[in-house]
UniProtKB/Swiss-Prot annotation:
Pfam families: DUF134. It comes from the Bacteria. This is UPF0251 protein Moth_1655. Disulfide bonds: none annotated. InterPro entries: UPF0251. The lineage of its organism: Bacteria, Bacillati, Bacillota, Clostridia, Moorellales. It comes from Moorella thermoacetica (strain ATCC 39073 / JCM 9320).
Amino acid sequence: MPRPPICRRVEFLPGVTYFKPAAVPLRELEEVVLAVEELEAIRLKDKEGLEQEDCAARMGVSRPTFVRILNSARDKVADALVNGKAIRVEGGYYHLVGPKVRCRRCGHEWEPEQGGKEACPRCGSEELAGRGPGRGRCHRHGRFGEGEH
């Protein structure tokens, strides 16, 4: 029986969780599911440009585990791009760390004050990502908004 996976720390929940090729009806597409921690690995390494050791530390895993997560994520993204598949970001074994909130409208990120208003300080939008299930204890997650399993 395999060991349960180590809970991964994630600092960011995406505002958009579905990507598909243009001009192809959804019903005709195959789908690739990218776990939240796989997206986090791509964000840390490819978007922020951190070294693998730093990425692993931020996610709370060993460097070899980080490399496996990153390689799995890159393989899924490449499969979707090369073969014209949709990408759905959902699920995984993670907990959200840090109080950062991201505005889904303008992309601004900030650390809200305790008891502060739940709206973007830049554009005033109340459409926020980064609040909700996933903080604290680690759980296996399904789709966003379905809670913890």
